[in-house]
Amino acid sequence: MKKILLTLSALVLLAACGPKQTYEYPFQNPKLKIEDRVENLISLLTPEEKVGLMMNKAISVDRLGIPSYNWWSEACHGVRQDGYTVYPQPIGMAAAFNPQQMYDVFSQVSDEARANWNRSDHDIFNVPMGVTYYPGNPELTFWCPNVNIFRDPRWGRGQETCGDDPYLTGILGLQTVLGMQGNDPHYYKTHACAKHYAVHSGPEPLRHTYDARVSQRDLWETYLPAFKKLVVDGDVREVMCAFNRYEGVPCCSNDRLLTDILRNKWGYEAIVLTDCDAINNYFTRGQHETQPDALHATVDAALHGTDLECGKTMMALTEALEKGMISEADLDAHLRRTLRGRFELGMFDPADMLPWADLGEEVISSEEHDALATQAARESMVLLKNNGVLPLSKGLKTVLVVGPNADDVALLNGNYGGTPTENHKHSLLEGIRAALPGADVRYSKGCELADDYNTIYHLPEFNDGKGMFVEFWDNNDMKGKPAASGYYNTLNFSTFGAYGFAEGVPTDKISVRIKGRFTPSFSGPMSYTVSSDNGYILKVNGRVVENAKPGMGGMRGFGFGRRGAEYKTFEVKAGKPVDVEIEYRRGAGPFAMLRADFCERKYADFAAEKQMAADADVIIVIGGISAQMEGEGGDKADIELPAVQQRLVRAMHETGKPVVFVNCSGSAIAFASVEDQYDALLQAWYAGQGGAKALADVLFGDYNPSGKLPVTFYASTKDLPDFLDYSMENRTSRYFKGQPLYAFGYGLSYTTFGYGEGKLSKGSMKKGGKVTVTVPVTNTGSVAGAETVQVYVKSLDNPDAPIKGLQGFSKVQLAPGATQKVSITLGDEAFSFYDASVDGLAVRPGRYQILYGSSSRDEDLKALDFQVL
């Protein structure tokens, strides 16, 4: 032992006497405080370099060994690239009412992000200088979560959120941030970003022009709480200011939002960044027009709180410096925050100093991650109606699966998602067939999503059934060999909420050629629709039929699905082959988009489907909408189930067979007109790569559904206020005075639960106190299941308060006959409302009811009286 100690001592001495690591500049020394390293680096930068570091594509500073970096990456429900795990859309994961699962999901997402970073060389002494990174390259800064309130179900981007309730949104958004950023005391695993700050939820086409004006009560009680929770409790490292104006001032220059509230009230010290090209809205004609030009717009944003721009307009700050409109000290204040962000992510430190250095590419799309994605999909599904049809027996002999979403793999990815690996791409139809290997599972698409235009390019007569052949070039001129190519059954390419066009092909300069040959079985007009960001050329049999310049055909139809598409025609003859070709070149705008469809317009009478159902044991209709009908840039015009699908449901009901409707959407759909036409309704959202297995598990009883609605399902579009009205009056479960079709928090199970008499730990409390409600819950059915116990607070003395507001919940798993006491504690936050005297929320004394139960419906709740002194 003595000899060993002497040897160790000698080694320590040798280490101490060995050569010390030397650094050319102090900022390179990881032993120094981050503050000192940041100040040193700032002192070494020229004014031009400082400006170049204030945009999302931050420049490289070769002389200092600083590589370029792209701040923009997305991870709404998985890293937004090809070949990564795709989890359910956040709106679906919110339906699980499972904060721990949300944390686990985003911990895995950040694992995959770090693994991607690790397999690329980002050491500042080794990375080739001058490299420019584009979305799709390894990044550590992710612009999620979206914690806007889903106030109106027509909003296209509501699927990215956690619903229409500020409490639920805050709780789940917080877990997203914690999972993304990690818990290391020295480094952040990745950066999360709270967006879009603050009063922002459509309409999408007006987001660059509208001025959100709301009462201070709505601001503080609805629109701000989730942001505050992420900032104060989550230490979120980035906040994205929204496109729109608030009270007349663009959000990215808004002193009220960025300085008074975010920095001063909440103590936020990290990065504020813009949505992409938001500063351009300041001076672009027909948009905000609050500034005359790019020069004044960038100065306005920089002097009023914006640290980092997604775009390149801030290059004008160099001219602003020369003209004395802004000082170098002003730039330094912004750089202290952005550069600190890169240091705290460990970008300038040796890789082996970071706790995630051993994460390799084996974690990317791993089986462990797929298992959680599948479990998250199971928990997301909400059973809204069941006349005893579900669960289905695995002994069924014949099943008819019909509907436009049944065999669409891309549907499951939703908005702002990547794409899974090939072995994890399975349609909902495939999931059902896998669960019934011995049954006759018949399939018909039945109809398209929203009208009687029937897509034909996936049929056998089109390119021998392969679909359309698409070639992608990494230049604007289709020069050289294509960078990628393949056959596609869906022509829907976009960087709006998507990772790109084709794997490995950067989209900053891209051109595309789509080709197909088909032999029509009919004579007459062939319908087509094409939309792009920069025009297109359509050729039929080598002849140019349409040469749409930018702005012609342009963005028309984006985000609205077929309801907003414009159709044109050309004539075809039965039996005569037709060659079609589309050429596209990306424009100069911030987003790229190309969508096309070739269709035969034919009224769907569903006679064939009725015949297929004649000897079926059950009919499973898989419909709803898709991210092509709701997403960034476009909203739904109404919330009704598309008319053609209503006809489909009625036709299937007429067969007399049991009908199970599986609805895929990222928002509430109004089913009132067909609610009596199906025997069971399952809300499946956009379920990610595990959706096929999850749906089958739920339908056939391998998993007992436990999801609860994170939004209100209204009976009709007529129940909704004006989309442009940001007042919360008569919106969501907190203020809606009507009768919803399916209420917030509602969801059935294959078992039943009974609620005993709840008890409060005390009958009153003062500010700073806490009260605990304890509720006995019993599984009164015959199968195990999970129940989400929900607690709402209703003020009896405050006429301006919500009708009731969610203030706590707990999900419990119970065996048949088992009883568990569930305790939920409420503090000041549950009894706080807007108070003008404090310019914010304050505890309000008075009489309250603490409500507990299985949903927000009055009939599902029991009340306990309580008082705040």
How would you label these PLM feature ranges?
Residues 1-24:
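Bacterial Sec-dependent N-terminal signal peptides
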